[in-house]
Curated annotation (Swiss-Prot):
Protein's UniProt name: Mitochondrial zinc maintenance protein 1, mitochondrial
GO biological process, one term: mitochondrial respiratory chain complex III assembly
Gene that encodes the chain: MZM1
Entry's localization field: Mitochondrion matrix
Protein family according to the UniProt entry: Belongs to the complex I LYR family. MZM1 subfamily.
Lineage per the UniProt record: Eukaryota, Fungi, Dikarya, Ascomycota, Saccharomycotina
Length: 111
């Protein structure tokens, strides 16, 4: 096992700790999934691809997964952390009108 593979594996375990802290069931399930995937690809002919994939998984977990906790009023409290990727909706707002086109004057036949 290469040091790069071991480093990618450890990074994935750290990513689960960041993403799923205080949720032991999900944390343990995520770690088991990573461990199983790592073991399955241990003797792979495409080791470099597997390392890249593991690093991408780590990055995705840390930057895109947030925990939500249901509050008494039925709303969810989202637990963002300092590495959570926060985007704005400007690109969505800009493309929305262009993609929708104009519905003004659209006619439909009713049968």
């Amino acid at each position: 096992m290469s040091s790069r593979a071991l480093s990618a594996y450890r990074a994935a375990l750290r990513a689960t700790r960041i993403s799923f802290q205080q949720d032991n069931d999900v944390l343990l399930a995520a770690r088991k999934q990573i461990r199983d995937g790592f073991e399955a690809s241990r003797n792979s002919d495409n080791a470099e691809e597997e390392i890249v994939k593991m690093n991408e998984i780590s990055k995705f977990l840390v930057s895109n997964i947030v925990q939500g906790e249901k509050q008494g009023d039925g709303k969810y409290f989202l637990k963002f952390h300092d590495q959570t990727e926060l985007g704005d909706n400007e690109t969505i707002k800009q493309n929305h009108k262009a993609n929708m086109g104009s519905l003004a004057g659209a006619k439909a036949k009713c049968r």
